A protein has these predicted regions:
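N-terminal secretory signal peptides
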Residues: 1-10, 17-27
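Bacterial signal peptide processing site
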Residues: 30-32
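Secondary-structure end/capping motifs
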Residues: 245-326
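Sec/Tat-exported extracytoplasmic proteins
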Residues: 100, 105, 115, 154, ...
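Conserved C-terminal helix/tail region of periplasmic/extracytoplasmic solute-binding proteins
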Residues: 317-354
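Solvent-exposed, polar/charged alpha-helical surfaces in well-ordered, non-transmembrane soluble domains
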Residues: 94, 98, 112, 148, ...
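Pocket-lining segment of extracytoplasmic ligand-binding domains
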Residues: 109, 190-281
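Short, glycine-/small- and polar/acidic-enriched structural segments
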Residues: 35-177, 182-185, 201-207, 228-230
Length: 354
């Protein structure tokens, strides 16, 4: 399959090529769909602690730091065999396929991507974010100031990650069709280089990457273009094979509660969180860390996943309309045996609707 090139409209083959690369090479001719009877977690969710010796490989860098800084890591009832410092959706999917990652955190789009290429995994926890988390950054000396100015411009577009859906939603809200712009297929790890070299005119960046970029290139005319586009979901998800292992499923159940408690701790102890994560891990100043944290909305964990499923369906439909993935009923992506566990683990003020 050829590497996708910049195009006004990237189709399903382009999406799958970008989503895969080495992933699709490993996938071979993996089927696009499978029989649902063989695709659902088996049995009731274990309620007790995981058996002694149970381990998980966890790809949630922020959680590693939150649990260590808060002391919650002492409550882990299983061994973390490795904390894997990966977060891009395609990398996580490759890790799932290679059986090197047991649980990870991403936005809502990677589970859709995984299903599209036959990698079976399920969502086990949901966090909602009712505030924009991405800002469109322009290349140096750009004239772009609003989303309407995107017409005719080159936009960095990673279809298999949250940033890709943010682009599609921003275009739709600005009254622009995908064909009104040039969608340049790039993984998000290449967005900064593409902006710096003016390979693209604009790219969606999250924090602290946005702050680092504007600190370096703001003097050259780079700027942030905010929109009100929300990327609602942060999810924990795990391969179906992991969830069908009773010992590992019990460990995932335990981790869901600690993950949520770590997120809540970071909100309630922002000075410690800024120092541990933004300053010591991400290399930004304490002042920039404070500005970033103050710009965020309070994390919320829904006890009921109906709203999350509706949002995920809207995302899947948007991707299907663009020809990037086959149509999908996203209800199959959620393992509702875990529904409400994260919400029950945090104070009432962190629950959706509070």
């Amino acid at each position: 399959m050829p590497t996708p090139s910049p195009s006004p409209r990237l189709g399903r083959r382009g999406f799958l090529a970008l989503a895969g690369g080495t992933l699709l090479a490993a996938a071979g001719c993996a089927p696009q769909t499978t029989n649902a009877a063989h695709s659902e977690p088996a049995g009731e969710l274990p309620t007790g602690p995981p058996p002694a010796g149970t381990s998980l490989a966890v790809a949630v860098r922020t959680s590693q730091i939150q649990l260590a800084a808060s002391g919650l890591d002492k409550n882990l009832p299983f061994k973390v065999s490795s904390w894997i410092n990966l977060n891009a959706g395609p990398d996580i999917i490759q890790g799932f396929r290679a059986r090197s990652i047991d649980v990870a955190s991403n936005a809502g789009i990677p589970p859709i991507q995984a299903e599209a290429i036959g990698v079976k995994a399920r969502i086990v926890a949901v966090q909602e974010r009712h505030h924009p988390t991405y800002t469109f950054a322009t290349a140096p000396a750009s004239s772009i100031r609003t989303a309407e100015d995107f017409k005719g411009k080159k936009i960095a577009f990673s279809q298999g990650q949250a940033q890709g859906v943010v682009v599609l939603r921003a275009l739709k809200k600005a009254g622009l069709a995908n064909s009104d712009v040039q969608l340049v297929a790039l993984p998000s790890t290449q967005f900064l280089t593409a902006l710096q070299s003016k390979q693209v005119d604009v790219a969606p960046l999250g924090e602290p990457t946005l702050t680092k970029y504007l600190t370096q290139y703001g003097k050259d005319g780079a700027r942030g273009v905010p929109t009100d586009v929300v990327d609602l979901l942060t999810v924990l998800w795990a391969p179906l094979e992991v969830l069908n292992d009773p010992a590992k499923a019990a460990a995932v159940r335990s981790y869901v509660t600690l993950w949520a408690q770590g997120v809540a701790w970071a909100w309630d102890n922002s000075d410690q969180w800024i120092d541990a994560y933004y300053v010591k891990d991400q290399g930004v100043s304490a002042a920039d860390g404070r500005r970033i944290v103050d710009s965020l909305a309070k994390p919320r964990f829904p006890a009921n996943w109906d709203n999350a499923i509706a949002w995920e369906q809207e995302t899947a439909d948007l991707m299907a309309e663009g020809g990037f993935v086959p149509k999908l009923d996203v209800k199959t992506l959620f393992d509702r045996r875990f529904e409400g566990l994260a919400a029950a683990a945090v104070p009432a003020g962190f629950r959706a609707g509070a």
